[in-house]
Amino acid sequence: MAFALLRPVGAHVLYSDVRLLSEDEENRSESDASDQSFGCCEGLETTRRGPGPGGGRRASSGAGPVVVVRQRQAANARERDRTQSVNTAFTALRTLIPTEPVDRKLSKIETLRLASSYIAHLANVLMLGDAADDGQPCFRAAGGGKSAVPAADGRQPRSICTFCLSNQRKGGSRRDLGGSCLKVRGVAPLRGPRR
């Protein structure tokens, strides 16, 4: 006698009255899939496994097609809200990052990379203080300028950022641009007491 190993066919294809599986149920491992009953051989399933934990067929929640549709619609609405929230946050972040040209539309990955670089740049500006009057603290601190500027407290500045590198490639300085990146958004640099 020959036996064939058959994989379960989706319930929604064979039986329209069986509820659709949620994402969690669809993502279960194949061993868990063997525990599911798709409407055929229900009596055989319970006698073979017997009652008890993990045995027998799963109790149906009594969810009809209308309930499943409502649950799916609610999940879709939550996902739309989440996506809208993420997009709003990216829009807010884009307004804080100086770009050239000013109206340049950044992708999400460009926004994250530029934000990271801008944070590093601002950290170097804070670390170096007044020592970087040319508007390129990261470039000078990395040794790319005429003299490397050490941090006031001996810490090493971070590597050159996109903003200082762009400024250096243009051959410009702080005075040529009419102010540092801090002044692009109307933020004045912090000036602490000189040591």
UniProtKB/Swiss-Prot annotation:
One of the Pfam families matching this protein, by short name: HLH
One GO CC term of this entry? nucleus
Keywords associated with the record: Activator, Developmental protein, Differentiation, DNA-binding, Nucleus, Phosphoprotein, Transcription, Transcription regulation
Report the domain of life of the source organism: Eukaryota
* Residue span of region Disordered: 26-65
PANTHER family this protein is in? BASIC HELIX-LOOP-HELIX TRANSCRIPTION FACTOR, TWIST, TRANSCRIPTION FACTOR 15
An MF annotation (GO) of this entry = E-box binding
* Phosphoserine: residues carrying this PTM: 60
| UniProt keyword annotation of Nucleus present | yes
> Taking every annotated instance into account, which residue ranges of this chain make up the domain bHLH?
70-122
- Kindly give the SMART domains that the UniProt entry links to this protein: HLH (SM00353)
Q: What is the lineage of its organism?
A: Eukaryota, Metazoa, Chordata, Craniata, Vertebrata
Protein name (record): Transcription factor 15
Q: Does the keyword Transcription apply?
A: yes
Q: Which InterPro entries match?
A: bHLH_dom, E-box_TF_Regulators, HLH_DNA-bd_sf
Oligomeric and partner information: Heterodimer; efficient DNA binding requires dimerization with another bHLH protein, such as TCF3/E12. Interacts with MEOX2.
Job description of the protein: Early transcription factor that plays a key role in somitogenesis, paraxial mesoderm development and regulation of stem cell pluripotency. Essential for the mesenchymal to epithelial transition associated with somite formation. Required for somite morphogenesis, thereby regulating patterning of the axial skeleton and skeletal muscles. Required for proper localization of somite epithelium markers during the mesenchymal to epithelial transition. Also plays a key role in regulation of stem cell pluripotency.
Protein location: Nucleus
Which GO annotations describe the biological process of this protein?
ear development; establishment of epithelial cell apical/basal polarity; mesenchymal to epithelial transition; muscle organ morphogenesis; negative regulation of hematopoietic stem cell differentiation; neuromuscular process controlling posture; paraxial mesoderm development; positive regulation of stem cell differentiation
Membrane-crossing ranges are: none
